[in-house]
Amino acid sequence: MPIPGESLSCNKSNSCLYQVRYGDSSYSNGDLAVETFAFDSSTSNESVVFPKVVFGCGHNNDGTFNETGSGIVGLGGGAVSIVRQLETTIGGKFSYCLTTLDSKSSSKISFGPNAIVTGPNVSSTPIVQKSPDTFYYLTLEGVSVGNEALAYYIPNSNSKASVEEGNIIIDSGTTLTYIPSSLYEGLESTLEKSISGNRVSDPQGLFGLCYELPNNGEFNAPSIIAHFTGANVELTQENTFVEVEKGVVCLTFVPSEDLAIFGNLHQMNFLIGYDLENQKVGFLPTDCSKTQ
């Protein structure tokens, strides 16, 4: 999601330039444009057409932009995102299902009433209204590893029972999950006691907990449950450890004293639905490589 502070300037010939910067330091500069967008329909063979959609035609891009993709779709709550521009048509509803890193299938995204995530295995958590409205704020009450529960307390709070509402954002554009150091340290310590393996230093200098991958490729780590208000999201080893270089796997939680973020590695193999009309996010464990 873009961070607050993007700029727009127009000249007398009605040509407008934009600048947008993302939380991972990637950026895009270029011309603002208007075009008709068409999407495949899930209910018919005809495309769904949206006229006069505002988008950026980037001429100077750097960071998480590459030639394998056509661009970035803005799914945030800000006024210029595709979600807000199509809000009346899609009813404030969209969902996506992110495949794993080694999957040969494409991830899926849906807009409109058919994007609602339903079923007995769906767990939902409220979206908390905070500023800036670009972000979708959730409340993370804590995490657990087995029987070990670790609470997310307000730093410097007089009450250890306090959990600040909207203390984390969910972002499909951020790779890792960032949590406060106080919570991270407890998580790392608990995992280290649970994992049998040769701990090694992070070759990239970014991760805190890394292990040597055995020659047989078998590395076993316990599942981690992220406890959101009303929703317990169980993260498997596929979500929580990633091979950062040949033979080294690292924990995908990292400490940060800035904004806490629930990143996309922890969203893999979940059908995640956003209902902005009812202000909630739903999680459904799903094999995203097999979704239609």
List where the protein language model places each region:
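Extended, H/D-rich, highly charged conserved domains that either
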Residues: G77-V80, R84-N114
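Signature of the N-terminal lobe/flap region of pepsin-like aspartyl proteases
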Residues: M1-V53, H59-N61
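Short beta-strand-centered segments at strand-helix junctions
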Residues: G71-I82, I179, I261-N264
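Aspartic protease catalytic domain
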Residues: G23, S41-S42, V54-N60, T88, ...
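Short, solvent-exposed loop/turn segments enriched in Ser/Thr/Gly
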Residues: G30-V34, G69, E164-E165, N220
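Hydrophobic residues embedded in beta-strands of well-ordered beta-sheets
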Residues: F37, S107-I109, Q279-V281
